[in-house]
C-alpha cells in the first residue's frame, strides 16, 4: 500500500530512525586524453615490435652451408668468376681487385659479439694488426659500443646486412632495406658509413651464380663494393684450432682475404688460432692490413652525415626499445600466467572446501531457523520495464516480508505502476531524485524489521530466496549475507558470456571470500543485512559508485561477518549490448577502486578488518586490477609469437590456459547446479569480452589516478524478467504480511 504522506510531499521519510545521507559532489568527466595516449603508445609499440620481430626472427645467423646447392652461372662475367675477391662496378663494366702480394686482410663476419669480438680485438691490438669487420645490423643495435671500439682502434667496418638473410632469395626492396638499415645502424652507433659489402653465405668468386650476380649488381647500384674471400677458415664449423689455423694459412706469397667469424657461436677456436696465425705469418714476411688498404681503395669508410646519424640513432633506440619491450612482455606474460594459475588453484580448492562446509554431510546449521519478518527495500529509478515482475516475485516469497519500494524521482511512472498493482504488504515511498544510496537510506529509515533485504528493481527472487538468505543471521556474528545472482537473459553470445562470468567468476570468488572471512561485496541485486549494523555505520554512503562494495567493506571493518548463501537465488537482467555492458562494468570497476582506496586502512588493522585488508583487498588488487592490466600484455605477446616465434608453441600455451578456464567453468557450473552447455562459447569469450573487460579496468584505473569523479548511470532495462509462477495478486494461502 502507499503512504499518503509520502505521496503528497514526494520526499517524505519517516523521522524515527532516520539515516543521515552522505552526500558527495560529483562531476561527470569523460576522460579521453588517455585513450589518445594509449593509441599513440600502441602504434609506437606495434612499430617497435614489428621491426624487432623482423630483425630478430625472420632470418638470423646460421651456418654458411644452409643455402643449398649452387645454381647456374650463365650471367656471371668470366672476369668476375676468375678474378679477384673485391668486385666493383658490377652493374656497369665490372672489374675486380686482389690484395697485393705478401698482404693479408683479416675479415670477421657476423659480429659484433659481446664475448668474442672484444677478445679478437685484444689479440689484434697486442699484435698491432688492423682488420675489417663485416657487421650485422641487429648486432650493431645490440652492441653499439663495440662498433665504436672497432672504429676507434683503426679497423674498417663493412656491411653484412641487417638480419643475415640469403640476399639472393629476397625481393629487391628487401635487399635495399637490409643494406639501408645496416648502414643507418652503423652511422648511429659509430658515426661512419661504409661502402664495403659482404653478402651472407658468400665465399669465393667461383661460387657465384646468377642469383648472386643479381645481388651484386643491385648492391653496386647502391654504391657498394662487394668483398668476397680467398681463404675460408671455416671456423663456423668448429673443426678444432689446428684445422682453423691450417685453413687460414696461405700457400705461397699471394695476397689473401681471410674469412673468419667473431660471432654466431663459440669462437674460442678462432681466438686461439689468431694468437698463432698472426705471429707466424708476420715472421714469414706477411703484412696485415684492412681490405681497403690491401687493394688500394680510397676511403671506403667515411664520416656519416648528420641526417644519417640522427636516423641511425633513432633506429637503434627503436630497436632497443623493442628488445626491452619483448623482454618485459615475456616477464609480464609469465607473471600473468603464474597469477592465473595461482588464482585457479586457490579458488577451486576453496570452492570445494566451501561446498563441504555448507552442504556436505558434516555441514553445521547456522542455528535455529530464522522466521522473523524481513523488510525488503527496492530502490527504483525509471524501472517500469521490470518493477512489476520484481515486486510480484517478492510478494510470492514463502517468508513474511514487508516490501518498501522507494521511487527515486522516476519519470516513467514506476511508482504509479507499483501502486496500481494493489499488492498486499507493498508500500511505495516517493522522493526527489537523489541517487540509489539516498533511496536505500530512505527505505532503511522506513523499515520496521531488524533484517533487511536490498533488491534492485530489475531483479526477480525465487520464492524461497528471502527465507534462505536470512538463515545465516541465526549466527549473531553475521551482519550481511550475499545471495546468488543469476543472469536471466542468457540468449546470444553476450548473454552467455555474462552468464559464464556470473557463475565462474563472481560466485567462485564469493565462496573463497566466505571461507577466508573477507567478503568485499554483497551485490545490490540480492543482499541481506542487519538493520542495526547499517544504522551504526550511518547508513549507505554515496561517496563511491559501488555503494554495495563500500557498505560491505565497512561492515567487515566494523567486525561483522559477511557470508555467501548460494541457495538464495535471484534473477537479474544483464546488459544486452556492448555499450551498456561497458557502462555497467566501468561503474562497477571504478566504484570498487574507490572503495578499495577508501578502506585501505584495513591493511594494517587487526581482526575482521585485517582479514578484509590483507586477504580481500590484496586479492582484489592482484586478480581484479593487476591481472586485467596484464591481460593486454598476454594478447600482444601471443600475436607477436604467432607471427615471429613458434606458432605451435604459442597455440599450445593458449589452449592450456583455455583448458584451465574450461575446467574451472565445469566445476563452477556443477557447484551452481547449472547445465554446462553455455561453456561452448568460452573460447569465443577470449576475443571480444575479455578485451572489453580489461579495457574497462584500464579506463577505471586512469580515471581513479587522474582524480576524476563519475556520476551514477542508470542501466538499460529490457523487460525480460517475469514473476515466478503463482505470484498472483491475491494473498490467500501466503505467509503473513507485515502491515505497512
Residue spans for each PLM region:
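N-terminal pre-catalytic segment of deacetylase/amide-hydrolase enzymes
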Residues: 2-106, 113-126, 275-280, 284-323, ...
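Catalytic domains of cell-wall/extracellular-matrix polysaccharide-remodeling enzymes
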Residues: 141, 162-280, 286, 293, ...
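Membrane-embedded multi-pass helical conduit in multi-pass membrane proteins
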Residues: 338, 342, 347-368, 619-706
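Short, acidic, metal-binding catalytic loop of nucleotide-sugar glycosyltransferases
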Residues: 392-401
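A conserved acidic beta->alpha catalytic loop
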Residues: 393, 407-416, 434
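Long helical/loop segments within the catalytic core of UDP-sugar-dependent glycosyltransferases
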Residues: 432, 437-441, 445, 449-450, ...
Amino acid at each position: 500500500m502507499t503512504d499518503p504522506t509520502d505521496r503528497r510531499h514526494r520526499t517524505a521519510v519517516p523521522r524515527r530512525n532516520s539515516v543521515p545521507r552522505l552526500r558527495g559532489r560529483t562531476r561527470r568527466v569523460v576522460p579521453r586524453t588517455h585513450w589518445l595516449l594509449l593509441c599513440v603508445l600502441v602504434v609506437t609499440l606495434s612499430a617497435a615490435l614489428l621491426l624487432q620481430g623482423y630483425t630478430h626472427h625472420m632470418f638470423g645467423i646460421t651456418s654458411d652451408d644452409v643455402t643449398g646447392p649452387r645454381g647456374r652461372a650463365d650471367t656471371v662475367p668470366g672476369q668476375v668468376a676468375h678474378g679477384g675477391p673485391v668486385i666493383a662496378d658490377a652493374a656497369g663494366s665490372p672489374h675486380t681487385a686482389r690484395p697485393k702480394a705478401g698482404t693479408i686482410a683479416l675479415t670477421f663476419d657476423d659480429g659484433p659479439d659481446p664475448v668474442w669480438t672484444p677478445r679478437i680485438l685484444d689479440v689484434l691490438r697486442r699484435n698491432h694488426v688492423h682488420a675489417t669487420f663485416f657487421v650485422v645490423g641487429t648486432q650493431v643495435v645490440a652492441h653499439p659500443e663495440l662498433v665504436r671500439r672497432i672504429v676507434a682502434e683503426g679497423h674498417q667496418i663493412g656491411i653484412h646486412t641487417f638480419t643475415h638473410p640469403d640476399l639472393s632469395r629476397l625481393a629487391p626492396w628487401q635487399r635495399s632495406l637490409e643494406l639501408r638499415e645496416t648502414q643507418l645502424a652503423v652511422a648511429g652507433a659509430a658515426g661512419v658509413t661504409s661502402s664495403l659489402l659482404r653478402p651472407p653465405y658468400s665465399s669465393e668468386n667461383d661460387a657465384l651464380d646468377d642469383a648472386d650476380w643479381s645481388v651484386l649488381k643491385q648492391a653496386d647500384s647502391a654504391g657498394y663494393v662487394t668483398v668476397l674471400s680467398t681463404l675460408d677458415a671455416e671456423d663456423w664449423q668448429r673443426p678444432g684450432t689446428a684445422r682453423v689455423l691450417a685453413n687460414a694459412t696461405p700457400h705461397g706469397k699471394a695476397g689473401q682475404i681471410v674469412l673468419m667469424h667473431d660471432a654466431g657461436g663459440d669462437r674460442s677456436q678462432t681466438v686461439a688460432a689468431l694468437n698463432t696465425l698472426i705471429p707466424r705469418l708476420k715472421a714469414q714476411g706477411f703484412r696485415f692490413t684492412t681490405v681497403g688498404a690491401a687493394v688500394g681503395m680510397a676511403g671506403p669508410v667515411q664520416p656519416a652525415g648528420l641526417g644519417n646519424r640522427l636516423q641511425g640513432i633513432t633506429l637503434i633506440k627503436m630497436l632497443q626499445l623493442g628488445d626491452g619491450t619483448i623482454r618485459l612482455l615475456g616477464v609480464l606474460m609469465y607473471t600473468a600466467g603464474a597469477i592465473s594459475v595461482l588464482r585457479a588453484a586457490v579458488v577451486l580448492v576453496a570452492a570445494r572446501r566451501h561446498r563441504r562446509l555448507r552442504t556436505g554431510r558434516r555441514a553445521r546449521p547456522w542455528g535455529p531457523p530464522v522466521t522473523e519478518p524481513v523488510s525488503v527495500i527496492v530502490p527504483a529509478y525509471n524501472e517500469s520495464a521490470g518493477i512489476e515482475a520484481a515486486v510480484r516475485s517478492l510478494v510470492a516469497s514463502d517468508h513474511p516480508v514487508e516490501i518498501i519500494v522507494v521511487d527515486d524521482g522516476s519519470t516513467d511512472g514506476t511508482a504509479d505502476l507499483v501502486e496500481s498493482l494493489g499488492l498486499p504488504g507493498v508500500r511505495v515511498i516517493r522522493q526527489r531524485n537523489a541517487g540509489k544510496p539516498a533511496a536505500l537510506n530512505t527505505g532503511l529509515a522506513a523499515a520496521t524489521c531488524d533484517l533487511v533485504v536490498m533488491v534492485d528493481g530489475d531483479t526477480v527472487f525465487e520464492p524461497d530466496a528471502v527465507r534462505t538468505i536470512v538463515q545465516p543471521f541465526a549466527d549473531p556474528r553475521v551482519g550481511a549475507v550475499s545471495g546468488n545472482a543469476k543472469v536471466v537473459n542468457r540468449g546470444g553470445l553476450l548473454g552467455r558470456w555474462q552468464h559464464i562470468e556470473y557463475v565462474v567468476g563472481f560466485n567462485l570468488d564469493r565462496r573463497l571470500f566466505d571461507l577466508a572471512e573477507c567478503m568485499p561485496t554483497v551485490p545490490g541485486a540480492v543482499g541481506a543485512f542487519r538493520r542495526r549494523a547499517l544504522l551504526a555505520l550511518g547508513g549507505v554512503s554515496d561517496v563511491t559508485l559501488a555503494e554495495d562494495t563500500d557498505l560491505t567493506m565497512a561492515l567487515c571493518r566494523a567486525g561483522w561477518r559477511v557470508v555467501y548463501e548460494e541457495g538464495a537465488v535471484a534473477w537479474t537482467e544483464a546488459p544486452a549490448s556492448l555499450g551498456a555492458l561497458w557502462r555497467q562494468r566501468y561503474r562497477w570497476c571504478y566504484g570498487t577502486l574507490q572503495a578499495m582506496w577508501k578502506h585501505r586502512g584495513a591493511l594494517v588493522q587487526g581482526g575482521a578488518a585485517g582479514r578484509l585488508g590483507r586477504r580481500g583487498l590484496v586479492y582484489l588488487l592482484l586478480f581484479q586490477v593487476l591481472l586485467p592490466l596484464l591481460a593486454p600484455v598476454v594478447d600482444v605477446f601471443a600475436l607477436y609469437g604467432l607471427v615471429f616465434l613458434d606458432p605451435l608453441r604459442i597455440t599450445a600455451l593458449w589452449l592450456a590456459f583455455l583448458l584451465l578456464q574450461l575446467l574451472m567453468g565445469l566445476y563452477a557450473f556443477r557447484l551452481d547446479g547449472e547445465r554446462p552447455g553455455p561453456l561452448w562459447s568460452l573460447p569465443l569469450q577470449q576475443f571480444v569480452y575479455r578485451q572489453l573487460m580489461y579495457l574497462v579496468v584500464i579506463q577505471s584505473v586512469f580515471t581513479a589516478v587522474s582524480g576524476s569523479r563519475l556520476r551514477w548511470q542508470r542501466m538499460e532495462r529490457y523487460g525480460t524478467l517475469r514473476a515466478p509462477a503463482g505470484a498472483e495478486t491475491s494473498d490467500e494461502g501466503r505467509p503473513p504480511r507485515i502491515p505497512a
